[in-house]
């Protein structure tokens, strides 16, 4: 049973790394405002941007959120709705108020 849990964790980690890699590669496509590692200049180290809701409001979230099951659930919803090859940044398909409530509980 412990082996299955560990394998599942590794699969989740690989999926999350793939999502972040796709998002960070957007700087190459979009041009300015990015450093040499293709990361947005206004995003502190250890964080990444996500876009939430119909208006695609931008939020900067810590990488530590990736370990929380609630946030992982949002990422899975994003994958189901947009896939990994989405040129509009990491978009979370949920209401902004729901996102704000969830992230305030995680912090």
Curated annotation (Swiss-Prot):
It is found in: Cell membrane. Expressed in cotyledons, leaves, flowers and siliques. Its main location: membrane. Induction: Up-regulated by brassinosteroids and gibberellins. Up-regulated by auxin. Up-regulated by phototropism and gravitropism in the region of the hypocotyl farthest form the incident stimulation. Transcriptionally regulated by ARF7. Down-regulated by abscisic acid and methyl jasmonate. Induced by zeatin. Keywords: Auxin signaling pathway, Cell membrane, Developmental protein, Growth regulation, Membrane. Interacts with BZR1. This is Auxin-responsive protein SAUR50. It comes from Arabidopsis thaliana. The gene is SAUR50.
